[in-house]
UniProtKB/Swiss-Prot annotation:
<feature type="binding site">
    <location>
        <position position="903"/>
    </location>
    <ligand>
        <name>Zn(2+)</name>
    </ligand>
</feature>
<dbReference type="GO" id="GO:0017038">
    <property type="term" value="P:protein import"/>
</dbReference>
<dbReference type="InterPro" id="IPR027417">
    <property type="entry name" value="P-loop_NTPase"/>
</dbReference>
<keyword id="KW-0811">Translocation</keyword>
<comment type="function">
    <text>Part of the Sec protein translocase complex. Interacts with the SecYEG preprotein conducting channel. Has a central role in coupling the hydrolysis of ATP to the transfer of proteins into and across the cell membrane, serving both as a receptor for the preprotein-SecB complex and as an ATP-driven molecular motor driving the stepwise translocation of polypeptide chains across the membrane.</text>
</comment>
<keyword id="KW-0547">Nucleotide-binding</keyword>
<dbReference type="GO" id="GO:0008564">
    <property type="term" value="F:protein-exporting ATPase activity"/>
</dbReference>
<feature type="binding site">
    <location>
        <position position="902"/>
    </location>
    <ligand>
        <name>Zn(2+)</name>
    </ligand>
</feature>
<dbReference type="InterPro" id="IPR011116">
    <property type="entry name" value="SecA_Wing/Scaffold"/>
</dbReference>
<keyword id="KW-0653">Protein transport</keyword>
<feature type="binding site">
    <location>
        <position position="893"/>
    </location>
    <ligand>
        <name>Zn(2+)</name>
    </ligand>
</feature>
<dbReference type="GO" id="GO:0005524">
    <property type="term" value="F:ATP binding"/>
</dbReference>
<comment type="similarity">
    <text>Belongs to the SecA family.</text>
</comment>
<feature type="binding site">
    <location>
        <position position="515"/>
    </location>
    <ligand>
        <name>ATP</name>
    </ligand>
</feature>
<dbReference type="Pfam" id="PF02810">
    <property type="entry name" value="SEC-C"/>
</dbReference>
<dbReference type="GO" id="GO:0065002">
    <property type="term" value="P:intracellular protein transmembrane transport"/>
</dbReference>
<feature type="binding site">
    <location>
        <begin position="108"/>
        <end position="112"/>
    </location>
    <ligand>
        <name>ATP</name>
    </ligand>
</feature>
Amino acid sequence: MLTPFKLFTKIFKNRNDRVLLRMKKVVDMINYMEKDIQKLNDSQLASKTNEFRKSIESGVKNLENLLPQAFAVVRESIKRIFNIRLFDVQLLGGIVLNSRCIAEMKTGEGKTLTATLPAYLNALSGQGVHIVTVNNYLAHRDAINNKPLFEFLGLTVGINLPGLSASMKRAAYTADITYGTNNEYGFDYLRDNMVFVPEERVQRGLHYALIDEVDSILIDEARTPLVISGPSDDTSLLYSKINELVFSIIQKNKRNIDNLQKEEYFTVDEKSRQVILTENGLVLIEQLLIKSGIMNQGESLYSSDNIILMHHVNAAFRAHILFTCEVDYLVKNGEILIIDEHTGRVMPGRRWSDGLHQAIEAKEHVTIQNENQTLASITFQNYFRLYEKLSGMTGTANTEAFEFQSIYKLDTIVIPTNRPMIRNDFPDIIYMTEHEKIEAIINDIKDCVKRNQPVLVGTISIEKSEIISHALSQIGIMHKVLNAKFHAAEADIIAQAGYPGAVTIATNMAGRGTDIILGGNWRAEITALHKANTCKILKIKSDWKKRHHAVLKSGGLHVIGTERHESRRIDNQLRGRSGRQGDIGSSRFYLSMEDSLIRIFASNRLVNMMKKLGMKSGESIEHPWITKAIAHAQKKVENRNFDIRKQLLEYDDVANDQRRVIYEQRDKLLNISDISDIIRNIRCDVVEKLFNIYIPLEIIENKRDVMKLEECLEKDFCLELPLLKWIEVEPRLYEEKEILRQRILENMTQKYEHTRKIIGIDIMCSFEKEIMLRTFDVLWKEHLASMDYLRQGIHLRGYAQKDPKQEYKRESFSMFTKMLDHLKYEVISEVSKLVIELFNKKESILNSTNKYNDFQSINTQVMNTKLLSIDHFLNQHTLTKNKTVSRNDACPCGSNKKFKECHGKIVNKRH
């Protein structure tokens, strides 16, 4: 009997069904046009692209009006080039992707070709389409495979891969459709906002992004920011010393536990992945630090002077206890390579932050690289929200539909499969111990091999995959292993995982991107042949049909999960490798009470129930209730991870607003040839600020304040003004300080105009832009570091009954305002130091000795960096140099000091 809710749903349909019903009408229109499109010859079909583009340019039609006809053209082109006719469900997927939504399409439903539909349509506007994949292999494969289609239709295709030169990247982005990875798109965006010449940028705007495996990129990797960094101070020796001390404490703690002693030095919180020192642990580490000379007698590890030491100690404990080799990372060629916890892939070039990577390098006794300082950063969440139009596709999105909507404003639409799903998903089997579970898995594999059924075994770490591999080797079962150690042969291994009796062990199947075809991949076999004649091809196809039939008879691909992942979505991705395109298949997960998910997150009720049953060694429980209990534990973890990602975004949104302001201002600077008006406005603000600092009251009450202002103008702006004399001569200035302010501004402006006249407007403009851009970058880098420090400690405000998020927003805004004020001050200060005396009106502007060939403006404590030399610009403008500056001449910087006492001193130090 139908419940009222089910009856209501049956009559009115759910939202997903209603959306698909509406889109089905568009599919009917595409099918209706198919006959007319089929009548066109190749030339007429290809010319449709120009016809569509003219319609858009003239404003007669927009993309939505063109969709049915454009999709019909792409479908017919695919049929002619690849001999494949797109299913109606693929057309539905294309419509969903064009509608700023996420399309959930099951494995094997043809997502790669589906993506060509919205990619073609959106490329017609000429603004570029970015197709985003999870790795370089997929980006290259999809671009090469789809290139014949797009080129037939008159569109260009680019591939954006790491290691390409700027000109090659620029060419890739200029193409109508660009394939690349999420990392590369994000890093290119950050690099583009660090250039000094507009022509050095590679991207041409963020119009439309279509993300493959969207859940992997927008959810799994949402907590990992993209960071461009530079080297910081060398602290490798300190990491090594602290590593030895922490290792000795861990060993001592282990001995205490083995000897049943109650004294513990630290506790481990696996849920929050933290190691917490106990009172005894704190006393011991302080004693060891003092004994080794790292800390002074009588000091505390928690004193403000030792915050960095505490940071190193925490990193060392986490490295030893929470991070495991061949689970979280690999050691290869003297390097620590991070393993992606979601995909099982190695991530070369990635490094953990906060000193953790250095702590792991110390733990594994490899070369410890310097810590890095952030130069620019952005999260994937905020990067992809910069696109005007965003969509994505994956086989598993519905479980994360709420997060997609709440964070990215993307609805999730589930596309029905072309054929009914007939895979048999068996209930989970749970054992008491890990050993019993492994035994049961091996027995299941043996049974499958006996009946010639292919098996895919999914593990969550390299360590687990090698345990299974070792057990299979001992009983003589041939198998292949796919993990971070052997990822180079990934596509070949997966392509042939459907062979009769094949056993494939894979670590985290998420995002592998290659379908498992029952009977093996005959196309891959043909491609592997150097010279494929018709007879060989026919034999390969004939053999494949026999193998395909044998696999179907044995039950199709059997998927074994060695434990549940934290996310149900990853489990569904593993299961989804079986039962593609209506194929028969099966899946089962084997669990034990020692699995981390059950041990950390499962409810006490489940654990107690297992104990009460009094299970004997080797016994197992198989019941839907167990599966539901595990799913509930996974949901708890998913909700917790969602809260973490949401909180991360809320904090990053603060930095993102500031990043947007900085990048917009920087972009504006790059595109203006003459920024003298900007300098003029900034100069007014700086003089106003100076007065507010040194003479805050309405009237001048203290001559000492005026003297300090006078000293500041001379030191920071090379402006010698007799302010005290002016006041003595004109007593009214005591009360009318606005007149004094205006006079200072006029003198500063006159000095500036004089400098422009001497140097030349073009050179001065180049200087000003260079100074402003470099000051932007240096202060932004320091601001990011300050924001990071603020973020790390802001949670402590909660103890004072204050909202940490509101406090973070308030303080970061205050810091940002101060940074902008500092920026103005530094720019005007540096520009003011560019005063150059005219030695010869008709000859050169600046002449120097051979040693003095790298004249630079004075470094300040804040900038601590060298600005581009005047000589560089003079050479660019073909100015000659033939007069020598002697040691006793006035320094050409305009400081009125002798050259030997000013920049001559700097030159001598440098040489």
